[in-house]
UniProtKB/Swiss-Prot annotation:
One of its GO terms (molecular function) is ATP binding. Disruption phenotype: Deletion of the gene slows growth on minimal medium with ammonium as nitrogen source. Disulfide bonds: none annotated. Keywords: ATP-binding, Hydrolase, Nucleotide-binding. Forms a complex composed of PxpA, PxpB and PxpC. SMART domains: AHS1 (SM00796). Its EC number is 3.5.2.9. It comes from Escherichia coli (strain K12). It is an enzyme of class 3 (hydrolase). Belongs to the PxpB family. The keyword Cell cycle does not apply. Catalyzes the cleavage of 5-oxoproline to form L-glutamate coupled to the hydrolysis of ATP to ADP and inorganic phosphate. It comes from the Bacteria. The gene is pxpB. The lineage of its organism: Bacteria, Pseudomonadati, Pseudomonadota, Gammaproteobacteria, Enterobacterales. This is 5-oxoprolinase subunit B.
Length: 218
């Protein structure tokens, strides 16, 4: 059993955080726990993260300590959730103006730009959780050969649709924002559109594959 610790954060929330390692199996149990918590009357929101879950309480002043005890027990009882997974292909133009850090990643990894693209697009990724921005997917299973530290100095503006690598993870920026990930490409696919019936394109558990476009490195 993977050990966990619970603690208060701010004035309204409790966090359950797992010890390393980060695995898809433990992430599936976090999804199940979040699903269980969201229907409870004293829970405002249950937010799954990477190896953790944050629970916002309706009456924290009277429930927080009890919630810590119960969260620990519920984690020990939780089972994996196999969500209804969709397979989504994301077209990407690698390199060029939309992927200004492709050469940096290639140099760091000792690969050619073409090899970086081939590796990055060869994997079927899983959406572990959404965060940072509405619809920003944190994707697991980035090949270890592509792990690259974030930029020492974040950019003041990263365009929407930018595909990046940050340490052991890869993802796509749904909206323009400051950001520190290494940008290797750009997609025209909209990951967040408030005008859609479902504004957020991806959900935890979805499978994603990046498809190189002929306009870029491929």
């Amino acid at each position: 059993m993977q050990r966990a610790r619970c603690y208060l954060i701010g004035e309204t929330a409790v966090v359950l955080e797992l010890e390393p390692p980060v695995t898809l199996a433990s992430q599936k149990r976090i999804w199940r726990l979040a699903q269980r918590l969201v229907d409870m009357p004293n829970v405002v929101e249950a937010i799954p993260g990477m190896n953790n879950i944050t629970v916002i309480l309706r009456n924290p002043e009277s429930l927080a300590l009890d919630a810590i005890e119960r969260l620990q027990r519920w984690w020990e009882e939780s089972e994996a959730l196999e969500p209804e997974s969709r397979f989504i292909e994301i077209p990407v133009v690698y390199g060029g103006a939309g992927g200004p850090d492709l050469a940096v990643v290639a140099a760091h990894c000792g690969l050619s730009e073409k090899q970086v693209v081939e590796l990055h697009s060869s994997v079927e990724y899983v959406v572990w959780f959404l965060g940072f921005q509405p619809g920003f997917p944190y994707l697991g299973s980035l090949p270890e050969q592509l792990h690259t530290p974030r930029r020492a100095e974040p950019r003041l503006l990263v365009p929407a649709g930018s595909v990046g690598i940050g340490g052991p993870q890869t993802g796509v920026y749904p909206l323009a924002t400051p950001g520190g990930w290494q940008l290797i490409g750009h997609t025209s696919l909209s990951l967040f559109d408030p005008a859609r019936d479902e504004p957020i394109l991806l959900r935890p558990g979805d499978s994603v594959r990046f498809v190189p476009q002929k306009e870029g490195v491929c």
